[in-house]
């Protein structure tokens, strides 16, 4: 009998399917009980794509000054958010997270080129790893913005942000940010 680890002892990452083939290599679904690698990925430049996507979400949620270094609190909030997502959608919350990342990552961005002292915006395709990083950043920024000075907990805000991003809801902060970035890139073509 082969025993597979489940994230938080509840959610099986092996049954999750990454539908966006561009980011499949950068979304790690390794089975771990507790998504906490103690920064082992920091030794090499692009090694962050080897750690669990749930841990990367928790690390991004620790961005604000009040949450810095409080990984256990953040992991508890992520676990509660996953329970809320499971109750509302009746799906594996890791699948909802992967769909949210695929939908919230911008496909096109703008860079500034200098032609004779004049800066000209130019639309470029976004690298897959940057798409995943940007999507995680937008999801965590939306969660922190919704929970700040609010009666709702971080777990509730994270659950609504994940569900909204997975459904491509324009009320979601991450989808709104992605659309704005792609709109600017479309204008700069």
Swiss-Prot record:
GO CC annotations on file: cytosolic small ribosomal subunit; ribosome
Pfam family, one: Ribosomal_S7
InterPro entries xref list: Ribosomal_uS7 (IPR000235), Ribosomal_uS7_arc (IPR026018), Ribosomal_uS7_dom (IPR023798), Ribosomal_uS7_dom_sf (IPR036823), Ribosomal_uS7_euk/arc (IPR005716)
GO molecular function: mRNA binding; rRNA binding; structural constituent of ribosome
Known partners and oligomeric status: Part of the 30S ribosomal subunit.
Family designation: Belongs to the universal ribosomal protein uS7 family.
Protein's recorded name: Small ribosomal subunit protein uS7
Name of the encoding gene: rps7
